[in-house]
Regions:
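Active-site nucleophile and cofactor-binding loops and adjacent substrate-binding regions
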Residues: 94-100, 145-148
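Membrane-embedded helical hairpins/re-entrant loop segments and their flanking transmembrane helices
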Residues: 34, 38-50, 55-92, 242-321
């Protein structure tokens, strides 16, 4: 299990609670060569990929509806992104797929101009992201304040939880019961069974129960078309001229910025969760390449998905590229050969798994009375504004930008006082 440790440094003495790995963890366990030579590690990484793939399905389908595209196409784009970033990405075990924040950016363009503009917009966004990485601009991430990071994590936990409410808030005792049973299985089974991830046990057992009992419940299949087979490559249906450029460039810039911001913030968070480092430059280049390939399948582009990344890293104990590669392969099999079986998974079960992810994502330490009392008021205000802006807009990038802007607008005198308080707290230690 993960240990929760309050991490205080001279630069950031307050608002951070870090989930650290147990002492027995070897830093070499995140290397592919080590994993493939160890049956135990290979099984662990593969099972982590299985539950991650299952956790991706409902969100990707929901986000495709927001963007106005076929769910099957978005799922295939997620397969492409997951496989591509497992090889080219700069952060091991970080899951990348078609994401909600990107869907929110693409949706207005699709509704106004049509789906034919998705491909050129995504291709342009991918090129921008590659240039961002080549030019080394990912290093600007170090200027994001810790209070904004804390707000980002807390807002994300809230957004993940709120997204699950429609799937378990029901007058049907069976739906509520499945949700509660999922919570109990995921929380209690690891005490007795450690070889198999508890979310996978919950999905298998409760899906078998609903199918064999003949109960009619909302399932994954109700969220969108799950026809079998592979979709073909998307053809460019619009001319490459100035009119097309005028339509796609605002969307492409937004996709590139939002995707990079969320991916790099997630990479930074996973760095802390696993006490390892990542290459932000490589992640930027890999994300751009992945989005270009995903766009060729008509996908809505994507970025790192922190909820599913936490499923992989914490629930599945995934640490290497093997886990995300396995997630992509399992998702490919589910979408093509086993789409009918996958469609029978109850949404209440997946909602239970993601609700626990939301609870584990939220930084509860940041709201403890002792933390609020000792933390500089400016940091608390910035954190709360970041949360409020993110939850109200449903866009993590806007929330982070709002927090950064508020921090930048703080009077110089208040900034000096904030710095002095941090220095004093460090000396007291």
């Amino acid at each position: 299990m993960l240990h929760f440790v309050i991490a205080r440094t001279e630069a950031r003495p307050n608002l951070r609670i870090v989930m650290s790995l147990p002492p027995a963890f070897s830093s070499r366990e995140d290397h592919v060569s080590t994993v493939v030579r160890s049956p135990h590690l290979l099984l662990r990484e593969t099972l982590a990929g299985v539950i991650t793939a299952l956790a991706l399905i409902p969100e990707v389908i929901s986000f495709s509806v927001v963007a106005g595209v076929d769910p099957k196409v978005s799922l295939m784009a997620s397969v492409v992104l997951c496989l591509t970033l497992s090889v080219l990405g700069g952060r091991r075990a970080m899951v990348t797929a078609a994401a909600g924040s990107v869907a929110l950016v693409i949706g207005p363009m699709v509704h106004q101009h049509g789906v034919q503009y998705i491909l050129p917009a995504v291709l342009m966004a991918g090129i921008i992201q590659i240039l961002f990485g080549v030019l080394g601009m990912a290093r600007l991430m170090r200027f994001i304040p810790q209070s904004v990071m804390t707000g980002f994590v807390n807002a994300l936990g809230l957004l993940i939880f709120f997204a699950q409410v429609p799937h378990f808030w029901s007058r049907s005792p069976l739906i509520v019961g499945l949700f509660v049973l999922t919570l109990l299985i995921v929380l209690w089974v690891p005490r007795y069974i450690k070889s198999v991830p508890s979310p996978l046990i919950a999905i298998v057992l409760l899906t078998l129960f609903t199918v064999t009992s003949g109960q009619v419940l909302p399932t994954v299949g109700d969220e969108g078309s799950m026809s079998s087979g592979l979709p073909g490559l998307t053809q460019l249906l619009v001319p490459l001229n100035m009119e097309t450029l005028s339509i796609i460039w605002p969307c492409a810039l937004s996709i590139a910025f939002v995707g990079l911001l969320e991916s790099l913030l997630t990479a930074k968070l996973v760095d802390e969760l696993t006490a390892t480092s990542s290459s932000k430059r490589r992640e930027s280049i890999g994300l751009g390449a992945g989005n270009i390939l995903a766009g060729l399948y008509g996908g809505i582009a994507g970025c790192a998905m922190i909820g599913q990344t936490i499923v992989n890293v914490e629930m599945g104990k995934g640490r290497s590229r093997v886990s995300t590669f396995a997630a992509g392969m399992v998702l490919l099999v589910l979408v093509t050969a086993l789409s009918e079986i996958m469609a029978k998974i109850p949404m209440a079960v997946l909602a239970g798994i993601m609700a626990i992810v939301a609870i584990k994502t939220f930084n509860w330490h940041s709201l403890q009375p002792a933390t609020l009392k000792s933390a500089p008021i400016a940091e608390t205000v910035v954190m709360l504004i970041t949360v409020a802006a993110t939850v109200s807009t449903g866009n993590l990038a806007i929330g982070v930008l709002g927090g950064i802007i508020v921090m930048a607008l703080l009077p110089a005198r208040l900034k000096r006082r904030l710095k002095e308080e941090k220095s004093l707290q460090a000396q007291e230690k």
